[in-house]
């Protein structure tokens, strides 16, 4: 359940859907496994996984939701070889060349015949709805997975007025300034990883890892006009993260010391522990968002 990535969106209008109403809305789009002829299935699943019993898990007016996607695995090469074999057989038997339309229809038949025997894979994506911040945080670095979740949530609710988080000044300008100064605004602390890009169309990209970012070698690239597009940071003693110029966060990691804050809850009651962990994570992500918005100079005015 602990988030590992953050793609950030904000609501254009206050999110005023209560837990019970949200649960009811999502229930119409509950995940069900693929049947023998389904290529993929997608829907909402228990927010807290197998041990959970609801599609929405709420605490302190913060709502955790989850979508599950199941996809049949049909290797393209397998389909290609089966199609070529069938086409060759038909063309030999009938002494003619098959038209493209016939080949396409034959390909569909092959896929249909293979589906019942195909393996499948499942993936899950969580999101945290934060009405107090008018934000929704998606635990994914994939634009496709994020959009799929938001599209299904929009379908369930009828509307979902959200836009990507944007700031008054470009994020890369702030990151570049922090690197020049040799420090990030508190409670953030720069670490030893950064990616710099030239703003020129054919400019280069320089990546530093496990290196002191205050060294002249690093700063020399700023003098040539490169800007910082990725920067590793610590948020206090609780979170390590990689902040990107599109305001997304990768490699989000809660420290062991922070997660140990719920050790007194124990593990005898798994649901109690999951609930406590969710409350702990939610409160710290709210604190992170407040600090991030302040450090980056404030949000751009939302267009209603």
From Swiss-Prot:
> Which InterPro entries does the entry link to?
RdgC
Instruction: Please provide the Gene Ontology terms (biological process) for this protein.
Output: DNA recombination; regulation of DNA recombination
Q: Which Pfam families match?
A: RdgC
* A GO MF label: double-stranded DNA binding
Recorded superkingdom: Bacteria
Gene Ontology cellular-component terms for this entry are: bacterial nucleoid; cytoplasm
Give the subcellular location. Answer: Cytoplasm, Nucleoid
The alphabetical list of record keywords is: Cytoplasm, DNA recombination
The entry assigns this protein to a family as follows: Belongs to the RdgC family.
Function recorded in the entry: May be involved in recombination.
PANTHER family noted in UniProt: RECOMBINATION-ASSOCIATED PROTEIN RDGC
UniProt xrefs under NCBIfam families: PRK00321.1-3 (NF001462), PRK00321.1-5 (NF001464)
What this protein is called in its record is: Recombination-associated protein RdgC
Q: Which organism is it from?
A: Shewanella baltica (strain OS195)
